[in-house]
């Protein structure tokens, strides 16, 4: 995080105590509304905001921490930033520090320097090889609520430290199941947008964008050939440029989600027979949303989406892809679900009778009482 993105505020008194600290605003509304709705004494800590305390007690504690805490492989400015947050958290004195940003470097740095607190993270995206290769800091979870058993295997193989894996599925998918449980199918295909305002051959993202653009061009060709009922799940990146891009390459009769409406992409998936994409988290989440998932792989390896071949189409020519999609659409959903039942615990382990939000809520209450 760059200092220029941080806003500074000033305060005379030390922060109030709270039992639960939500670290960072990302996903905090979901946590408060759906996971912690019956829990009191919650504070949301905004990592883009620093409160400067003109308080002698705070200042002395901060200086003591600077002298006593050693953080390796970290710039001086980041070290001071982490120690300052640690000092503030010591005054807040939470039992639980929870985040919906499971690969946040500040969260993991704090987990090593703050003792006698329970650190809980909720997985909010796929953690495939091309993502893991870019993470240079140490991962350390007390509890990780992950998508499935497959995540546990990947974490172990990558030497990510997780004391307690809780494979409960996707929290947002669980919320969507509650919110949209009576939807009927309206679309043949939902294409998941992974749009980023980047140019081709951008090495900064391991050429992921190049593959996604190619997948989009392939699907555009297929959509012009066939009269499918289509909806595009927009991600909202790039503002109006994302919609402009799709409208420039797709037929006029295509529907689009509204990124400004909560969980609208999840609604679109639940209304679609087949969900198609490259390496979006939504593609895996569709397994819990009564849709049939298909990755179109143009990368010739599994570094972007390492799952069973049942969910992957190795692209060679458009006729083969067309045949694969038609086969998927023709299968009754109950038959499809039965054919993938052994993969559900591994990839998206949602129990519709005990959704992720309920499991996390119950576990948090148990920790608070312990």
What is each model feature region?
Residues 29-33, 78-83, 206-221, 357-361:
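Well-ordered, non-membrane alpha-helical segments in soluble/globular domains
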Residues 52-59, 129-135, 154-157, 175-180, ...:
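Short, charged, surface-exposed secondary-structure boundary motifs
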Residues 348-370:
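C-terminal alpha-helical cap of glycosyltransferases
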Residues 173-246:
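Conserved catalytic-core segment of nucleotide-activated headgroup transferases in glycan assembly
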């Amino acid at each position: 995080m760059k200092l220029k993105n941080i806003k500074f505020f000033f305060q005379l008194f030390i922060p109030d105590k709270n039992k639960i600290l939500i670290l960072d605003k990302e996903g905090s509304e979901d946590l408060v509304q759906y996971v912690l709705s019956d829990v009191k004494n919650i504070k949301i800590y905004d990592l883009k905001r620093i409160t400067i305390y003109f308080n002698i007690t705070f200042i002395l504690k901060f200086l003591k921490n600077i002298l006593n805490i050693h953080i390796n492989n970290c710039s001086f400015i980041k070290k001071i930033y982490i120690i300052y947050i640690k000092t503030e958290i010591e005054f807040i004195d939470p039992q639980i520090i929870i985040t919906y940003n499971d690969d946040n470097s500040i969260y993991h740095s704090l987990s090593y320097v703050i003792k006698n607190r329970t650190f809980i993270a909720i997985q909010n995206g796929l953690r495939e090889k091309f993502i893991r290769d870019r993470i240079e800091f140490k991962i350390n979870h007390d509890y990780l609520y992950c998508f499935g058993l497959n995540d546990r295997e990947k974490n172990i193989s990558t030497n990510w430290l997780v004391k307690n894996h809780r494979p409960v599925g996707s929290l947002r998918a669980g919320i969507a199941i509650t919110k949209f449980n009576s939807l009927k199918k309206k679309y043949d295909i939902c294409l998941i947008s992974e749009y980023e305002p980047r140019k081709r051959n951008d090495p900064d993202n391991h050429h992921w964008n190049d593959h996604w653009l190619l997948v989009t061009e392939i699907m555009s060709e297929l959509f012009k050939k066939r009269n499918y009922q289509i909806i595009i799940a927009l991600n909202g990146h790039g503002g109006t440029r994302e919609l402009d891009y799709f409208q420039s390459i797709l037929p006029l009769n295509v529907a689009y989600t509204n990124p400004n409406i909560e969980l609208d992409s999840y609604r679109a998936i639940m209304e679609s027979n087949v969900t198609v994409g490259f390496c979006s988290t939504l593609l895996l989440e569709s397994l819990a949303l009564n849709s049939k998932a298909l990755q179109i792989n143009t990368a010739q390896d599994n570094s972007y989406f390492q799952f069973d071949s049942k969910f992957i189409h190795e692209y060679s020519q458009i006729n083969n892809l067309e045949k694969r999609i038609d086969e998927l659409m023709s299968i009754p959903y109950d038959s499809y679900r039965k054919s993938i039942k052994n993969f559900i615990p591994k990839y998206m382990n949602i129990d519709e009778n005990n959704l992720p939000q309920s499991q996390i809520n119950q576990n948090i209450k148990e920790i608070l009482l312990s």
